[in-house]
């Protein structure tokens, strides 16, 4: 399972259009999103420019591209000297402009995710207050529940960052998890509608499997003429970086262990990535319609 942040803009069970896009178009979109910040407004901008793609696909593409951007710049923002400058700048501003969205403004000025900046500033505050580096658990708890932060002004500013960041933060993590589960439920429902017997990830773990796809079919099926033993649900867009990572960390091992399978990128994928069918990995942007049981004929 994997999911994109944000709301589910399209139904999980119905295809609104073909969500495969060529690599050239993907690059055009990725160049466009370089100028955008991770705010709710950015989605309106994307939908205005790319009207043929649903919001869920655009959000997934933007989120993945923005996360790449943040990873490239993270070392610069994590420098102790830079952090001291950011923190002191925030504390000085909070003295006179406490009611303003100071951390959101600072995040925009230094080109850093609001939720990531909030985490860094909270860490600086707790380290200054307690003279020790806070644990990850303490940080996570306070980011999830800002009322736990002793400084009420800082708590308000951190909450603003969490609410307004569509790529990072505890709120986004919860939404991503929920969307991932929603699409897994849709996959199971589609299989049951076609009377296809399967074991899901939870059932496989009970049987002692550790690393498994979302679905193992008890009786293989054929999709587009290719045999499928397993299905993996990805509530995200399949770009080069994410797909290659999944190939190396998941899909090839599934193939070696269970045979050929199907990956569903519910929010679409780069069409050129569907090039491993002969090696056992088939890509789809929704539940397939061309399904044949290997022992019972076409499914109705």
Curated annotation (Swiss-Prot):
It is found in: Nucleus; Cytoplasm. One of its GO terms (cellular component) is cytoplasm. The keyword Cytoplasm applies. Keywords: Cytoplasm, Nucleus. Transmembrane segments: none annotated. InterPro entries: CDIN1 (IPR029404). One of its GO terms (biological process) is erythrocyte differentiation. May play a role in erythroid cell differentiation. This is CDAN1-interacting nuclease 1. It comes from Danio rerio.
